[in-house]
Design a protein with these regions (language model features):
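Secretory/organelle targeting and membrane-embedding segments
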Residues: 1-165, 169-506
């Protein structure tokens, strides 16, 4: 169904959602309270949702629609990016409904069906429905089957139905395939939106613009000039209250399998024919398919667990001392792996991926490190005085990019030193970047899936990670300890040192 607010001649309004209802399963969870509802409000506040938009919360709380609206106001006041506007909120609240019940309660789904019928009349939703499953994956099958049984999915109505699922997309390749089969047995593949919120970040999308919208980078983006690539996701916090989720998952399953391998795919992919969803996702899938696993998994990986100690001015407890944890747990809070991509462009260029908690600072970045220039003219300088040029894309928190190169130091001597040239979103653009969930929710409502991985991408990611997980699970020892506030265990530094390289200090 076309969007009546979208005029092909008017480029200003080409991303306003049409009529519809967004149904949140698990509306009382942390993600919905802190990210999803504030993002929906921010979209409305920016004029990107129609005035008759509807929101349905589904949860176990015994709430009325007014109770839900009152709670939503508190969540929005606490976490929304844009200023609170009473008129905008009142318009949004008028379309809020709440369904009280368990995820396997047939009566609740009957009430949901009746509510969506009512909204089709009172809010003119056009029977367009997006079901957002902000729930544990163990409930995906039940919810999808109930939606199908109650004719809320694959129904022959004039509108559309889409389903949104959050990571983790399984815990290994077998479970990912099973999950994909379950979801796609109810919803067609093009109606399934797998959320990886990193792909909604401006800097991640800007990576495509930097690579393919400029002439200066792409000629150097290959194994003739690139020495290696480092992709880092560091957090300065511990597991907090996520003990029940994190134990048995670990850093690799939590972020390397999804966020970091997606960043690798975007960094290494060939230029797509267009930004059409199929073209973009096909190029990412080709990269992941070409990832070559190392023969020696131990030499190409490192794991760690943070210990008790001081992080800045704060004394923190170690991972094994966190409440609710098994003191003999083999779950890692830090993981690093070395991968190679078996293509003509990237053959011989290692990609180093690392992620961890309680590290030196919160930062996510992609660093493309170039080979050293020949030291022919500057013969009175030692080779180690010449750094390697690098192009660094900062995903968070200071979104932007940095180029590192050598320059002459002012003075009478020909002395060389590394300097940086910096681009920051906050300095270059007056409008602040929207939150990732704003972009992704809007894309769901518009039916534009380029930023959402297909099941083939998910399965390829697990194909890459599973051998590491199996190798680590067979080790008789726990992951290596590292101090809070450091940059991981010594084994991670040794992983790089074996290749004559070092980790960047973000």
């Amino acid at each position: 169904m076309s969007n009546p607010l979208r005029d092909a001649r008017d480029r200003r309004l080409n991303r306003i959602a049409g009529p519809g209802a967004l149904v949140f399963f698990g509306i009382t969870g942390d993600l919905a309270r802190k990210k999803l509802m504030p993002a929906v409000y921010d979209l409305a506040n920016r004029g990107l949702l129609p005035p008759n938009f509807a929101i349905v919360g589904f949860g176990r709380r015994d709430w009325t629609a007014q109770d839900f609206a009152d709670q939503a106001r508190e969540w929005i006041l606490a976490s929304a990016r844009t200023p609170f506007n009473e008129t905008v909120f009142a318009q949004l609240a008028a379309g809020m409904r709440f369904i009280s019940g368990a995820f396997d309660d047939d009566g609740a789904y009957e009430q949901l069906a009746a509510t969506l019928d009512e909204l089709a009349e009172s809010r003119s939703t056009g029977r367009n429905h997006a079901f957002y499953l902000s729930i544990p994956p163990s409930w995906f099958e039940v919810v999808c089957q109930k939606l199908s049984e109650h004719k809320l999915a694959q129904d022959k109505n004039p509108g559309w139905e889409r389903v949104v699922i959050e990571k983790p997309f399984g815990h290994d390749l077998a479970s990912a395939r099973e999950l994909n089969s379950i979801v796609e047995s109810v919803f067609p593949p093009d109606a399934v939106f797998r959320i990886d919120h990193y792909l909604g970040k401006e800097t991640v999308q800007n990576l495509l613009a930097l690579r393919f919208g400029n002439q200066m980078f792409e000629p150097l983006w290959n194994n003739k000039y690139v020495d290696h690539v480092q992709i880092t996701m560091a957090e300065d916090i511990g597991i907090g209250g996520r003990a029940s989720y994190y134990d048995g998952v670990g850093a690799a399953r939590d972020v390397i399998q999804n966020h970091l391998l997606q960043l690798l795919a975007l960094t290494a992919m060939e230029e797509p024919i267009s930004f059409d969803a199929d073209h973009l996702r096909s190029e990412k899938e080709k990269v992941l398919t070409a990832v070559k696993l190392p023969e020696d998994l131990g030499a190409a990986s490192a794991r760690g667990q943070y210990t008790s100690g001081w992080q800045g001015a704060e004394e923190v407890v170690g991972f094994l001392d966190e409440e609710g944890f098994n003191p003999k747990s083999n779950t890692e809070t830090y993981a690093a792996v070395k991968l190679e991509i078996n293509t003509r462009r990237w053959s011989g260029v290692p990609f180093y991926l690392r992620a961890g908690k309680r590290l030196g600072r919160r930062v996510t970045e992609i660093a493309v490190v170039f080979k050293k220039a020949p030291n022919l003219l500057f013969t009175d300088h030692e080779d180690d005085e010449f750094g390697q040029n690098a192009f660094v894309i900062r995903v968070q928190p200071d979104e932007g990019a940095t180029i590192r190169f050598s320059s002459k130091v002012p003075g009478t001597q020909m002395e060389i030193r590394d300097v940086t040239m910096d681009f920051g979103y906050g300095n270059a653009f007056t409008e602040s970047s929207p939150e990732a969930y704003e972009r992704l929710i809007l894309d769901v409502l518009l039916g534009e899936p380029p930023l959402f991985p297909r099941h083939e991408e998910v399965e390829q990611s697990w194909r890459i990670l599973d051998p590491f997980e199996e190798y680590w699970a067979a080790l008789p020892t726990q992951p290596d300890p590292y101090a809070p506030g450091s940059w991981g265990p010594e084994s991670s530094d040794e992983l790089m040192a074996k290749d004559g390289r070092t980790w960047r200090r973000p």
